[in-house]
Each structure stands twice: as structure tokens, then as C-alpha cells.
UniProtKB/Swiss-Prot annotation:
Renumbered residue ranges of the record's region Disordered: 172-216
Gene3D superfamilies: 3.30.70.3270
Catalysed transformations (reactions): a quinone + NADH + 5 H(+)(in) = a quinol + NAD(+) + 4 H(+)(out)
Membrane topology designation: Peripheral membrane protein
Official protein name in the record: NADH-quinone oxidoreductase subunit I 2
Free-text comment on the cofactor: Binds 2 [4Fe-4S] clusters per subunit.
Top-level EC class as recorded in UniProt: translocase
Cofactor(s) in the UniProt record: [4Fe-4S] cluster
Cellular localisation: Cell membrane
Keyword Membrane: yes
Residues engaged in binding [4Fe-4S] cluster 1: 51, 54, 57, 110
Biased composition regions of type Low complexity, renumbered to the chain: 172-209
Length: 216
């Protein structure tokens, strides 16, 4: 049987009429902010204090959108008799988000936890050059990085936390030992000063010497 002319249009209008009577489900962005899933990839934040300028992130980036400049400085020895050493100092760290494809390789390969994902995605610009975020802007994104999920109570303690705790305990023990040594030295100095004062008092001549025999 040949289809009735206009039946397809009628079916389409029927679907439209049924949909018009239902409640809308469209999220009116930006009036209603979306609920992002965990581990959303929005923008990359830089924790500059952890960066050692190893250049690993820039070398592994497939888009070559990470720009790093640095210089070397000489650090004096930490202890007397030690040797000076040189270290890299970060001058520039920038990411061009107009080239970035958000693969996350730079975050994965960073051995010092200096790069993190932030769920923030509202950084559109009218000028493409503004999408190159320098280290000050990347630091601002760092404060929008969500806290890591809580550890499972039955899980083993991470080795980084265990190492940090051991280091803190050693430092506290060294400080306590140094304080005890200082206190003992202070007590010894006080005792020595008191002994010297007593010896000086015993050896001092009397204020009124006795007259010798034959003197009036």
C-alpha cells in the first residue's frame, strides 16, 4: 500500500506536540552550572614550589605547547667544609591552551607532582594569544584543584607520607637532643661560674687584717 502523502509530516508533528507538553530538561548554562564528574579535565594548574625544571613535561608533550625558561644558580654548602652545588631556577613556565589537547601526559610524567588537573573550564578568550597562560595564571588555577579522595582505612600508608613522617620524627629528635645539650651546657656554665665565685671569695684577704705582735 502506498504511503499516504504527508503522513511523515504528521508523525513528526505528533512527536513535537508530545514533547512540547513535557518538562524541559535542558540545563540553561551559564545560569545553571553543570555537575562535573570526578577527574574532569578542565585546565592545568602549576605548583611552582615542586618544579625542578627537569623539562620532562615539555619534552613529552605531543603538542609542544609547554614553554619553560630557566637559569642556574650556585648554592652555598649546607654544612662547613661542604661543596657548592648548582640548581635550576624557574624563569618562565607557560602552557598554550590553544594547542593543548588535554591528553594529560605532562601530569603523568611529572616526577615531582608539580602539575595537576583543575575542573575549571571557563577560560574562553576573544584573543587566541590570551590562551597562553604564564606561571602566575597557572598558579591561580592551582587553588581550584580539588583535594584528593580520602584513603581507604585498610590501605597501606603511602611511601611518601611514611618517608615524610620519618624525616619529621628525626628532625624532632635532633632538635630535642640539641635542646638538651644546650640546657646541659648552660647548667655546667652556671655551676662553673658559681665555683669560680666561691674560690674567689675564699682567696680574698679580710677587710680588716689583724695587728701583728709588737704593734700598738
Amino acid at each position: 500500500m502506498a504511503p499516504i502523502p504527508g503522513s511523515g509530516l504528521a508523525k513528526g508533528l505528533a512527536v513535537t506536540l508530545r514533547t512540547m507538553t513535557k518538562k524541559t530538561v535542558t540545563a540553561q548554562y551559564p545560569d545553571a552550572q553543570p555537575e562535573l564528574p570526578p577527574r574532569s579535565r578542565g585546565v592545568i594548574g602549576l605548583f611552582e614550589e615542586n618544579c625542578t625544571v627537569c623539562m620532562l613535561c615539555a619534552r613529552e608533550c605531543p603538542d609542544w605547547c609547554i614553554y619553560i625558561d630557566s637559569h642556574k644558580e650556585t648554592v652555598p654548602p649546607a654544612a662547613p667544609g661542604g661543596r657548592e652545588r648548582s640548581r635550576n631556577v624557574l624563569d618562565r613556565f607557560a602552557i598554550d591552551f590553544s594547542l593543548c589537547m588535554y591528553c594529560g601526559i605532562c601530569i603523568e610524567v611529572c616526577p615531582f607532582d608539580a602539575l595537576f588537573w583543575s575542573p575549571e573550564f571557563e577560560y574562553a578568550e576573544t584573543d587566541i594569544h590570551e590562551l597562553t597562560h604564564e606561571r602566575d595564571k597557572l598558579r591561580e588555577w592551582m587553588w581550584t584543584v580539588p583535594a584528593p579522595p580520602a584513603l581507604d582505612p585498610a590501605a597501606e600508608e603511602p611511601k611518601e607520607i611514611a618517608a615524610a613522617r620519618k624525616t619529621a620524627e628525626k628532625l624532632a629528635a635532633a632538635q630535642a637532643a640539641a635542646a638538651q645539650t644546650d640546657a646541659a651546657q648552660a647548667e655546667a656554665a652556671q655551676a662553673e661560674a658559681a665555683a669560680e665565685a666561691g674560690s674567689a671569695a675564699e682567696g680574698a684577704p679580710d677587710a680588716a687584717p689583724k695587728p701583728q705582735e709588737g704593734e700598738a
